[in-house]
Regions:
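Bacterial N-terminal signal peptides
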Residues: 12-22
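Bacterial N-terminal signal peptides that target proteins for export
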Residues: 2-14
Length: 360
């Protein structure tokens, strides 16, 4: 998810009627050239927009074991309507075929899915949010199409609005639970990150991660990265024109992960509120096989994909112009160095110099 001011900036271009398309390549919006280490992002690498038929916020891009690219389309019900302008959309998961360029609806309603990952067996695991969404973690068997609720309650109470997830090599799923929009009552005591063990046990592993958003485990399984992206509001869609919020922590944080999947030793790698030009924090992220972090940065003056060392030092930067990116994901096999990213209504790709990490 993202900041209220960034979302509202794009609403004027949305309108009441949303056309769902499965077209191939769209017009290149002409992004600035990437900068930084050419071994990370080669000179001349360009973003290619392959889809622009979402409503407001595409998210959660991930490569399936079938070679297809799946991503969420969070259709805010106050803004994304049918042709009559009366009835809100119920969320979509799209499927993009890299070989044909065709993009089709994989699932609708989506339960307002946000983050998507695939486990080692090829099952899709999706974090469902609020705003008439599922507020749960769901696994889909990609062979049968059947879905299963992995967790929908913590301490007997509904989650706020699941946002993003990461899966470790022991099959444990870590997920974040903030709230950015939706009419549903909030029952949890705060924002947090959780761990779902293979036996179904759910543990709150971090209550000190701010408004927890993107989450990523390092390839060596020793470090957990968690984004705090705090817009200072629970239901941005109800803010009146001109109203402002007091925004809090915008951070890239790291934790140690022990053998049991518990987190400790929290430290802040980047405080986006204390940069020379303070800005909103990042969103989703993935890792390459060397442990570098590829992160969707939503800095208002510099939106794009930041490539960082495990210590938070920038190696390269892929500008998305005025587009505010939401999430990233690597392809598989021969396309392991093909980076996919979601932003606004669109899906993009760019060939980079590193291979993405996937579960073995």
């Amino acid at each position: 998810m993202t900041k209220v001011q960034n979302i509202k900036r794009g609403l004027a271009a949305v309108g009441a009627t949303v056309v769902l398309v499965g077209a191939a390549h769209a017009v290149d919006p002409g992004f600035p050239a990437p900068i930084g280490d050419p071994s990370v992002v080669p000179a001349g690498a360009k973003l290619d927009r392959v889809f622009d038929g979402g409503c407001i916020l595409t998210e959660g891009v991930a490569a399936g074991h079938d070679g297809m690219i799946y991503f969420s389309d969070i259709t805010f019900t106050k803004f994304c309507k049918d042709a009559s302008g009366k009835f809100g959309q119920a969320g979509n998961i799209w499927k993009h075929n890299p070989k044909t360029g065709e993009t089709t609806v994989f699932r609708s309603p989506s339960g307002m899915s946000n983050g998507i990952k695939f486990d080692r067996d090829g099952n899709m695991v999706a974090a469902l949010g609020a705003d008439f969404g599922g507020q749960m973690l769901v696994r889909t068997d990609m062979k049968t199409g059947k879905s299963y609720i992995l967790t929908g309650l913590f301490d007997g109470k509904p989650y706020n609005a699941l946002n993003d997830l990461t899966i470790d090599e022991k099959g444990r799923i870590y997920f974040t639970d903030p709230r950015y929009l939706g009419h549903e009552p909030i029952f949890q005591d705060g924002f947090a990150a959780y761990r779902l063990d293979p036996d179904g046990t759910v543990t709150r592993v971090a209550a000190d991660c701010g408004k927890c958003n993107g989450i990523l485990i390092s390839p060596d399984q020793k470090t957990m990265y968690i984004i705090s992206n705090d817009n200072g509001w629970f239901a941005f869609e109800n803010l009146k024109q001109g109203e402002k919020t007091l925004q809090s922590a915008h951070l890239l944080q790291a934790y140690d992960v022990d053998a049991n999947g518990n987190l400790s030793n929290r430290r802040v790698l980047i405080d986006y509120g204390k940069l020379d030009k303070p800005c909103s924090g990042p969103d989703g992220m993935v890792a390459d096989t060397e442990g570098n972090i590829w992160m969707a940065s939503r800095c208002e003056h510099r939106p794009g994909i930041q490539v960082l060392t495990p210590q938070g030092k920038e190696l390269a930067y892929i500008s998305t112009g005025k587009e505010m990116p939401t999430n990233v994901g690597f392809g598989r096999g021969a396309d392991s160095n093909l980076l996919w990213l979601t932003s606004g209504k669109s899906l993009y790709k760019i060939r980079v110099g590193k291979n993405g990490y996937q579960l073995p």
